[in-house]
């Protein structure tokens, strides 16, 4: 018991301190400054290394158990130049000296460095700075507004941070926003560097829960991008996927496969790519992209001034229209496997305009007249009926509406 003083000098080796009751001091000898010390945590033990090697320094048993409960332990570090460091006055700069073990911070503001291996780091409470380093790290920020640092070559790190309100992901030198690509996989936001899926950051549960959407991307050139306030350009895989976007203005490239896309509330651009896709624009003024060979897509829309934009090689003359069960079916070049089905076209799901790559367009009123005229109008100069009985209405007829 009592306020004890422990003395450690260069060359003293690796000592273990088992504090009793009292507020204790660890006094370092000549030639040792505060900047010479490295701190590490393993379970509840605090390791203080002098220099970068692990064979010189002090281990304080149960330090963090006492620290977290504001109980007495070794509190002060004294140096020969007269400076004093209070170990309980703030957070720590912690390094990973123990491979294949996790790193935990404190309830104060810590700086935590991972190793070149794949680490698991838990910042606990406090606004921490977490540098995972190389390897595929798992990073938990805990409470507080945390900062995650990622540099080129750092691998693919996973971040879980539901408790912050203004956390940051800071990218290192020579990384700008345009270098990043975004993808939704299993409701996690993947941010890849230059499209390399082994390099970047994964924000877990980003699309599943708004609590996880609190990060701002910060770049070395001073620019930033707030993920909680802006839409994304999502570039998906070529497999069959079911995913959602944000409630902001998104651009979605689904790739190949039979995909199901839920765009949210923003003014979105949805490109289902190849395959038979389900596209749900939601609220907002949405644009659905359809290109030759794009399969047969089903569009579910709700509100807004919405459009279908057809790609190169598709004009109004290539389309045929069929209306039934309150839906509008648009077939391309008479191929029933190519086109779109607009669900609830006569209700909240209507599409207001069709756009073409040649610059022409047709409004919803004209499209509805086309549907109504299909069985009543068949002059050879204005329309033609293909071998399947579907009506393809020409530009000449549109001009006369």
Where are these regions (language model features)?
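Extended carbohydrate-recognition surfaces in non-catalytic/accessory domains of CAZymes
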Residues: 237
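Leucine-rich, hydrophobic repeat-scaffold detector
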Residues: 103-108
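Low-complexity acidic/polar repeat-biased segments
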Residues: 49-101, 192-234, 331-401
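Acidic, glycine-rich calcium-binding repeat modules characteristic of RTX/beta-roll
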Residues: 1-45, 49, 53-73, 109-188, ...
């Amino acid at each position: 018991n009592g306020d004890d003083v422990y003395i450690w000098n260069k060359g003293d080796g690796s000592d273990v301190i088992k504090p009793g009751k009292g507020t204790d001091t660890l006094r370092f000898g000549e030639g040792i400054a505060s900047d010479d010390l490295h701190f590490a945590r393993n379970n509840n033990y605090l390791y203080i290394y002098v220099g970068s090697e692990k064979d010189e320094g002090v281990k304080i048993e149960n330090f963090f158990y006492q620290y977290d409960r504001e109980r007495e332990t070794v509190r002060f570090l004294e140096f020969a130049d007269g400076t004093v460091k209070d170990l309980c006055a703030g957070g720590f700069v912690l390094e990973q000296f123990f491979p294949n073990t996790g790193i935990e911070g404190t309830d104060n503001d810590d700086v935590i460095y991972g190793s070149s291996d794949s680490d698991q780091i838990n910042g606990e409470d406090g606004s921490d700075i977490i540098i995972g380093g190389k390897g595929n790290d798992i990073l938990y920020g805990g409470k507080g507004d945390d900062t995650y640092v990622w540099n080129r070559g750092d691998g693919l790190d996973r971040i879980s941070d539901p408790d912050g309100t203004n956390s940051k992901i800071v990218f290192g030198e020579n990384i700008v926003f345009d270098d990043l690509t975004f993808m939704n996989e299993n409701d996690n936001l993947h941010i890849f560097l230059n499209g390399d899926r082994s390099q970047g950051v994964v924000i877990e549960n980003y699309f599943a829960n708004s609590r996880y959407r609190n990060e701002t991307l910060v770049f070395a050139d001073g620019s930033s991008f707030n993920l909680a306030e802006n839409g994304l350009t999502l570039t998906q895989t070529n497999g069959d996927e079911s995913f959602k976007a944000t409630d902001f203005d998104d651009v979605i490239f689904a790739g190949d496969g039979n995909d199901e896309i839920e765009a949210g509330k923003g003014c979105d651009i949805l490109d289902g790519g190849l395959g038979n896709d389900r596209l749900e624009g939601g609220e907002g003024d949405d644009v659905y992209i359809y290109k030759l060979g794009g399969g047969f897509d089903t569009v579910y829309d709700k509100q807004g001034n919405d459009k279908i934009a057809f790609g190169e090689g598709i004009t109004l003359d290539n389309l045929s229209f069929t209306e039934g069960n309150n839906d509008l079916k648009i077939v391309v070049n008479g191929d029933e496997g190519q086109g779109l089905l607009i669900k609830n076209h006569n209700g909240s799901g209507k599409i207001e305009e069709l756009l073409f790559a040649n610059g022409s367009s047709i409004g919803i009123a004209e499209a509805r007249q086309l549907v109504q005229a299909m069985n009543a109008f068949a002059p050879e100069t204005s329309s033609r009926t293909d071998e399947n009985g579907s009506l393809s209405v020409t530009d000449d007829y549109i001009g006369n509406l």
